[in-house]
């Protein structure tokens, strides 16, 4: 069996990626999230496949087909709850994975980082089109509001929006194509994940200290397979607790009402994992400016490798940068809270301050802190 593992053309690739992979001996639980994201993706594809067997992408029957899945299909309620809450777990792991990358300087593996940002955007697109499918009130109005943002593009905006809608409003054509996108995008994500891993295994993983780990490597199996299984158990326990005890906690009550173009919900807001970007969008009183800020809030991640000024890779030995990183974390907890609040004072001003702080920390303050820490490293005698 050992020979087959090392000689068979297919099994050899798996062996080099998950079994005999040389891994740094000191990577912490923060390095668990890559494998957790892989498991999340598998769960989402499998539950999504079973939901697609019973779902109909027609405006007249979409809402009732979801109700039918929950009431009449064997364990349909469980599959749907796992799929809906699985998305929340996916994004939770994604945000922690990106945060780990920023804290420990993983972004200096530029190819891996850039593919990761593309993956983040693709997952966000998949989640957005997926949220439209149950055809509840928030599905319909969320689709209307977010697709309408494209009309802010000068000259071609209105044409572009109508092209995406497939008509003059969000209707049957929109729902059908969103279902098609929601079905195909996860497979594109799988392909991107393979490329992400390919680039990662070119360089190997970084580690908390930020120094070259080549002199001290251990095989991935059994050490990190066991460690990842612990993280997996914790994640699955959390997901099952959510799906079985409070499946609707993270959803919007408005989505229990069928979509009606004649009835606007009092507060249109996306799922919690988009609220940080939604808060930044709303904090700018100009439509085009808001759309650009929304895009910048995610695309700014592509600039992070270029803004690295420190002589050290990780934040482990950089107290000033650590303080700024945790300020950024606090800011990214404040923004979703603001995104879920009505547009009135004092939430407007808090959102604007939080948005300015978000961009300032990444573009100005953290690079300056890196330079200051470099200066403090120099001997003064």
Curated annotation (Swiss-Prot):
Residues binding a ubiquinone: 201
Superkingdom per UniProt: Eukaryota
Binding site for heme b b562: 83, 182
UniProt keyword list: Electron transport, Heme, Iron, Membrane, Metal-binding, Mitochondrion, Mitochondrion inner membrane, Respiratory chain, Transmembrane, Transmembrane helix, Transport, Ubiquinone
One Gene Ontology term from the biological process aspect of the record: mitochondrial electron transport, ubiquinol to cytochrome c
GO molecular function (one): metal ion binding
Binding site for heme b b566: 97, 196
Main location: mitochondrion
Transmembrane feature ranges: 33-53, 77-98, 113-133, 178-198, 226-246, 288-308, 320-340, 347-367
Extra remark: Heme 1 (or BL or b562) is low-potential and absorbs at about 562 nm, and heme 2 (or BH or b566) is high-potential and absorbs at about 566 nm.
Function in brief: Component of the ubiquinol-cytochrome c reductase complex (complex III or cytochrome b-c1 complex) that is part of the mitochondrial respiratory chain. The b-c1 complex mediates electron transfer from ubiquinol to cytochrome c. Contributes to the generation of a proton gradient across the mitochondrial membrane that is then used for ATP synthesis.
The family this protein is said to belong to: Belongs to the cytochrome b family.
Complex and partners: The cytochrome bc1 complex contains 11 subunits: 3 respiratory subunits (MT-CYB, CYC1 and UQCRFS1), 2 core proteins (UQCRC1 and UQCRC2) and 6 low-molecular weight proteins (UQCRH/QCR6, UQCRB/QCR7, UQCRQ/QCR8, UQCR10/QCR9, UQCR11/QCR10 and a cleavage product of UQCRFS1). This cytochrome bc1 complex then forms a dimer.
Full protein name: Cytochrome b
Taxonomic lineage: Eukaryota, Metazoa, Chordata, Craniata, Vertebrata
């Amino acid at each position: 069996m050992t020979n087959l593992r090392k000689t068979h053309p297919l099994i050899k690739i798996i062996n080099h990626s998950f079994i005999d992979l040389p891994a740094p001996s000191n990577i912490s639980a923060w390095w668990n999230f890559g494998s957790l994201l892989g498991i999340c993706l598998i769960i989402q594809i499998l539950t999504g496949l079973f939901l697609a067997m019973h779902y109909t992408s027609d405006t007249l029957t979409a809402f009732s087909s979801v109700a039918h899945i929950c009431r009449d299909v064997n364990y349909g309620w469980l599959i749907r709850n796992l799929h809906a809450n699985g998305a929340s777990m996916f994004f939770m792991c994604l945000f922690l994975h990106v945060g780990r990358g920023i804290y420990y300087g993983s972004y200096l593996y530029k190819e891996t980082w850039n593919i990761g940002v593309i993956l983040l955007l693709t997952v966000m697109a998949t989640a957005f089109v997926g949220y439209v499918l149950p055809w509840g009130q928030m599905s319909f109005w969320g689709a209307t509001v977010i697709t309408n943002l494209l009309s802010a593009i000068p000259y071609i905006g209105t044409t572009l929006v109508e092209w995406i809608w497939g008509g003059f409003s969000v209707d049957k054509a929109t729902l059908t194509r969103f279902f098609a996108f929601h079905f195909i995008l996860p497979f594109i994500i799988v392909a991107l994940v393979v490329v992400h891993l390919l680039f990662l295994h070119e360089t190997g993983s970084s580690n908390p200290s930020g120094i070259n780990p080549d002199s001290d490597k251990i095989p991935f199996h059994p050490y990190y397979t066991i460690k990842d299984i612990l993280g997996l158990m914790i994640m699955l326990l959390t997901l099952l607790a959510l799906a079985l005890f409070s499946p609707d906690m993270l959803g919007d009550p408005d989505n229990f009402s069928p979509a009606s173009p004649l009835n606007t919900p009092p507060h249109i807001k996306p799922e919690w994992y988009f609220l940080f970007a939604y808060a930044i969008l709303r904090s700018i009183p100009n439509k085009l400016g808001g759309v650009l800020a929304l895009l910048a809030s995610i695309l700014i991640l592509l600039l992070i490798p270029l803004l690295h000024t420190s002589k050290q890779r990780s934040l482990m030995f950089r107290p000033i940068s650590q303080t700024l990183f945790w300020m950024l974390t606090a800011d990214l907890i404040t923004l979703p809270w603001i995104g879920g609040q009505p547009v009135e004072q004092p939430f407007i001003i808090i959102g604007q301050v939080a948005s300015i702080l978000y961009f300032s920390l990444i573009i100005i303050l953290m690079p300056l802190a890196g330079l200051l820490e470099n200066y403090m490293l120099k001997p003064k005698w």
